[in-house]
Amino acid sequence: MRLKTAGLLTLATLLGGATNANAAMLYDIYAGLTLGAGGQTIFAGDDNNSTSAAAYGAVIGMDIPLVRIELEYNYLNASESHMHVGMINAYFKMPSTVIKPYLGIGLGTVFNGDVDDTFNIRNEAAYQGMLGLTFDIPVIPFNVDVEGRVLYAPDVFKTADAKPDLLHYDLRLKLRYVF
């Protein structure tokens, strides 16, 4: 009887361990930081104002074999404007080994910012597209993403005669810790 009980406990332990190992293979949870450099243009009718810009942010997400979903916060800092951006992103990954190309889209909002310390940025919808490469570091639980991205936000603030649009574009480095 003791041998039968010991065998059942051993089997339960092995099956429980196998279940956890398989669950870890299905998806990964991650958190990370981003840093980007590029430019932005504010379009107001025939008047276009382009400046250099930087982006700083944080992400948290879930990585599934062919898709990655994440929540992202960014602070966009240009010489004439400063703003906060919250996005929900979806990435579609090409299956590969260590270097994985991907294509991404995002939907979110631009909020709490200003242009020339004169105009307050309204809470407006924002859209973005990303194209990049993920470098999977197999020995340590980090992934490094290098990507180009374009963010578009229509009617970010209102003047007496115009509702300018924002186009932000940058090259971004993202470091993700995989739990």
Which residues does each predicted region cover?
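Cleavable N-terminal export/targeting peptides
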Residues: 1-27, 179
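Short sequence motifs at beta-strands and strand-loop junctions characteristic
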Residues: 50-54, 80-82, 121-126, 163-167
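Gram-negative (and chloroplast) outer-membrane scaffold detector with strong preference
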Residues: 59-128, 135-144, 174-177
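Solvent-exposed loop/turn segments connecting transmembrane beta-strands
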Residues: 44-52, 76-83, 117, 159-160
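Short glycine/proline- and aromatic-enriched beta-strand/turn motifs that initiate or cap beta-hairpins
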Residues: 21-75, 176-178
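Contiguous, function-dense segments enriched for cysteine-driven chemistry
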Residues: 142-153, 157, 168-170
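Outer-membrane beta-barrel "beta-signal"
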Residues: 166-179
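A short acidic, helix-capping loop that chelates divalent metal ions and anchors anionic groups
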Residues: 41-43, 113-115, 155-157
